[in-house]
């Protein structure tokens, strides 16, 4: 009925072994069952579930045991939604969220508290802006994409032209295009393109506090760990 690490699991818990450095905990685990590969099965004192990819198998089991909350629909009384915005009836707009003119919010989208969806932004079906997320510059967010708290999409890239000893701002005219099934961690920023768009393709996973500068192209299924900076 629960999932737990090898060393902390007790009766009723499912655990897993995917990293050899934790193998020492296998012989003393009290889990009811362990997901592991065939090479480790003989060392387990408890029933095993064999898998070529124990970590992925554990992840799927955890999703079944801890399902996400059912999506809500409607608009919180404190939200501000421009009358030209298109909000699907099956979407949820949370407390103090702002949806600006001509934005398009698709079916089952969840917009959390304090989010800002700028003018002309499009957010695809089933995507989630968790809390205090800002999406600007007519950005396009695909389907089933998650933006964690504090993410900023579409802020200006760093464009400055040196003119006779001072700096002049270079207008940032592009946007941001984010594909389906993308996950972007807390306080990550993705700048709009200077002329062409900044692009994050399908299935990309980005950790917390990453900076993606203007005109960056991130290919499908890329994974990026925390605190990385990617120059434009």
Give, region by region, the residue ranges found by the protein language model:
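Structural signal for interior beta-strand "rungs" in well-ordered beta-sheet cores
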Residues: 16, 74-232
């Amino acid at each position: 009925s629960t999932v737990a690490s090898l060393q902390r699991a007790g009766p009723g818990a499912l655990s897993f072994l995917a990293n050899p450095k934790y193998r020492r905990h296998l012989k003393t685990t009290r889990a009811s069952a362990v997901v592991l590969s065939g090479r480790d099965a003989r060392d387990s004192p408890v029933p095993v579930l064999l898998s070529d990819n124990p970590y992925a198998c554990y992840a799927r089991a955890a999703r079944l045991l801890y399902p996400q909350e059912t999506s809500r629909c409607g608009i919180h009384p404190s939200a501000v939604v421009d009358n030209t915005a298109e909000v699907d009836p099956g979407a949820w707009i949370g407390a103090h969220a702002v949806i600006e003119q001509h934005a398009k919010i698709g079916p089952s989208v969840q917009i959390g508290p304090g989010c800002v969806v700028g003018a002309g932004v499009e957010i695809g079906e089933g995507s989630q802006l968790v809390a205090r997320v800002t999406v600007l510059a007519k950005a396009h967010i695909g389907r089933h994409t998650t933006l964690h708290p504090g993410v900023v999409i579409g802020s200006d890239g760093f464009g400055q032209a040196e003119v006779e000893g001072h700096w002049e701002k270079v207008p940032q005219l592009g946007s941001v295009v984010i594909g389906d099934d993308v996950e972007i961690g807390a306080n990550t920023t993705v700048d709009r393109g200077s002329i062409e768009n900044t692009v994050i393709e399908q299935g990309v996973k980005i950790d917390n506090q990453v900076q993606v500068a203007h005109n960056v192209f991130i290919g499908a299924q890329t994974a990026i760990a925390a605190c990385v900076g990617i120059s434009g």
